[in-house]
Amino acid sequence: MKKNTHPEYNKVLFVDSSTGYKFVCGSTYQSDKTEVYEGQEYPVCYVSVSSSSHPFFTGSKRLVDAEGRVDKFLKRYSNAKPAQPVQAPAEEGPVVKGKKKAPAKKKK
């Protein structure tokens, strides 16, 4: 088996950028930035959403805007015109189709 094919698994400090909540978890994430947490120095990874800020875990009803996706949607469709009703074509009378003929039999 080849050696050094997998990245190193170390403890990493994850910081929720919206609440400041910090927790240490094992990961293969590598970073040049480090922070001291509970007396030890860890590589740090900043996350935008964690269990301390996500509405599912906090029970709040606020909307999580993922990098402006909601604003982008509203901007795109707020100026859209409402759909026009489709008008049925005027009926001139019943349309009669001709009878289909059975396919001719092939001779052997």
Curated annotation (Swiss-Prot):
A GO BP annotation: translation
PROSITE patterns linked to this entry: RIBOSOMAL_L31
Domain of life assignment: Bacteria
Keywords: Ribonucleoprotein, Ribosomal protein
Basic residues bias (residue ranges): 97-108
Entry-linked InterPro entries: Ribosomal_bL28/bL31-like_sf (IPR034704), Ribosomal_bL31 (IPR002150), Ribosomal_bL31_B (IPR027493), Ribosomal_bL31_sf (IPR042105)
GO molecular function terms noted in the UniProt entry: structural constituent of ribosome
One of the record's GO cellular component terms: ribonucleoprotein complex
Chain segments carrying region Disordered: 81-108
Keyword Ribosomal protein: yes
Keyword Iron attached: no
Subunit annotation: Part of the 50S ribosomal subunit.
NCBIfam families: L31 (TIGR00105), PRK01678.1 (NF002462)
Record PANTHER family: 50S RIBOSOMAL PROTEIN L31, CHLOROPLASTIC, LARGE RIBOSOMAL SUBUNIT PROTEIN BL31C
Family as reported in the entry's similarity comment: Belongs to the bacterial ribosomal protein bL31 family. Type B subfamily.
Name used for this protein in its record: Large ribosomal subunit protein bL31B
Natural source organism: Chlamydia caviae (strain ATCC VR-813 / DSM 19441 / 03DC25 / GPIC) (Chlamydophila caviae)
